[in-house]
Amino acid sequence: MSLWFLVFLSVLQGVTELFPVSSLGHTLLVPALFGMHIDKHAPQLLPFLVALHLGTALALLWYFRARWVALIGGFFAQLGGRKNDDGHLMWALIIGTIPTGIVGLLLEKRIERVFHDLRIVAIALIVNGVLLWLGDRIQRSRAHQAPEKMTFKQAFFVGLAQIGALIPGFSRSGLTMIAGNAAGLTAEKAAEFSFLLGTPIIFAAGVLELPKLFHARDQLADALLGGVLTAIAAYLSVRFLMRYFEGRGRLASFGVYCVIAGVFCLGWFMLHPQPV
């Protein structure tokens, strides 16, 4: 893997994992648009992807470090019988993580095999854009509540939304923000809940494959560089997005981008079919 391609993929992962535009979809579509081929069976790819996931998760953990300390403290306080908002929210995050954890372990590889056609990925990106636009309308029409007041049923519903992101072209953060809006969260709080909810999933995706990173010691330098670059890009992304949604930013803007990008990619790959 060339240095510039390594930098490109690392930054692409760090940005699109958190922006509601589908990191997996972009990782498949963008290199193909530029005629770059990603060999899924290349020995250096898996340890590299492991490092990218860990870099993203560490960036999220660092950005929300004070929040996580409060959540963990509240969780143990609640176990000791002292009910509190942070403990309730921590339980909500645990419940929201369960659906994707189970389905991801059972079906992720099968889903990847079905959605290997880039034209299907482009269509999924278009649908993702439409859903973001609809989610924006939902957010503006609902009464708002704090994440700490979410019911466990609502948290489970938001967690179910993450399952859609197993399909390339659908965004994990986008779908969970939409579900958070439907549960009555403001755009800012839906984004925060989405990032908190996604942290264990993204972290687990890296940790489960961590042994393979150390088995490929000749690839450690590339993986380490990729992880650092992804962490920087992810940190800057989450910082931007939280400020964006605090300032009345809208999901619809990302929806428009996804539709335009998806239509362009669909047309391109219909005219230039890729080998499958």
Swiss-Prot record:
GO molecular function: undecaprenyl-diphosphatase activity
Catalytic activity field: di-trans,octa-cis-undecaprenyl diphosphate + H2O = di-trans,octa-cis-undecaprenyl phosphate + phosphate + H(+)
EC main group: hydrolase
Enzyme Commission identifier(s): 3.6.1.27
Xref: InterPro entries: UppP (IPR003824)
GO biological process: cell wall organization; peptidoglycan biosynthetic process; regulation of cell shape; response to antibiotic
Membrane topology: Multi-pass membrane protein
Transmembrane segment boundaries: 1-21, 44-64, 87-107, 114-134, 150-170, 190-210, 222-242, 251-271
Keywords: Antibiotic resistance, Cell inner membrane, Cell membrane, Cell shape, Cell wall biogenesis/degradation, Hydrolase, Membrane, Peptidoglycan synthesis, Transmembrane, Transmembrane helix
UniProt record similarity statement: Belongs to the UppP family.
Miscellaneous note of the record: Bacitracin is thought to be involved in the inhibition of peptidoglycan synthesis by sequestering undecaprenyl diphosphate, thereby reducing the pool of lipid carrier available.
The protein's role, per its UniProt record: Catalyzes the dephosphorylation of undecaprenyl diphosphate (UPP). Confers resistance to bacitracin.
Name of the protein in its database record: Undecaprenyl-diphosphatase 2
The organism of origin for this protein: Burkholderia lata (strain ATCC 17760 / DSM 23089 / LMG 22485 / NCIMB 9086 / R18194 / 383)
